[in-house]
C-alpha cells in the first residue's frame, strides 16, 4: 500500500472518520440521556 495510491487525502478520511465516531457517540449518549437508549 503506497501512500500515493489513493486519490483521497488521509486527513480527509481521518476527519470523516472522526466526525462519524463523534456523531455515533453523541447519539448514543443522547439516547441514554433521553431514556430511549434501551429501546435501540
Curated annotation (Swiss-Prot):
* UniProt xrefs under NCBIfam families: PRK02565.1
What family is this protein classified in? Belongs to the PsbJ family.
InterPro entries for the chain: PSII_PsbJ, PSII_PsbJ_sf
Keyword Membrane assigned:
yes
Q: What does this protein do?
A: One of the components of the core complex of photosystem II (PSII). PSII is a light-driven water:plastoquinone oxidoreductase that uses light energy to abstract electrons from H(2)O, generating O(2) and a proton gradient subsequently used for ATP formation. It consists of a core antenna complex that captures photons, and an electron transfer chain that converts photonic excitation into a charge separation.
Keywords linked to the UniProt accession: Membrane, Photosynthesis, Photosystem II, Reaction center, Thylakoid, Transmembrane, Transmembrane helix
Protein name (database record): Photosystem II reaction center protein J
Q: How does it sit in the membrane?
A: Single-pass membrane protein
In the UniProt record, does the keyword Transmembrane occur? yes
Where is it found, in Gene Ontology cellular component terms? photosystem II reaction center; plasma membrane-derived thylakoid membrane
Q: Which domain of life is it from?
A: Bacteria
- Name of the gene this protein is made from: psbJ
> TM segments?
8-28
Taking the record's annotation, the residue ranges forming a coiled coil are none
Q: Which HAMAP family does its entry note? A: PSII_PsbJ (MF_01305)
Subcellular location, in the record's words?
Answer: Cellular thylakoid membrane
**Single biological process term from Gene Ontology:** photosynthesis
Complex and partners: PSII is composed of 1 copy each of membrane proteins PsbA, PsbB, PsbC, PsbD, PsbE, PsbF, PsbH, PsbI, PsbJ, PsbK, PsbL, PsbM, PsbT, PsbX, PsbY, PsbZ, Psb30/Ycf12, peripheral proteins PsbO, CyanoQ (PsbQ), PsbU, PsbV and a large number of cofactors. It forms dimeric complexes.
Amino acid at each position: 500500500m503506497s501512500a500515493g495510491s489513493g486519490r483521497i487525502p488521509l486527513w480527509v478520511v481521518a476527519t470523516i472518520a472522526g466526525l462519524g465516531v463523534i456523531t455515533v457517540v453523541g447519539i448514543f449518549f443522547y439516547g441514554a440521556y433521553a431514556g430511549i437508549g434501551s429501546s435501540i
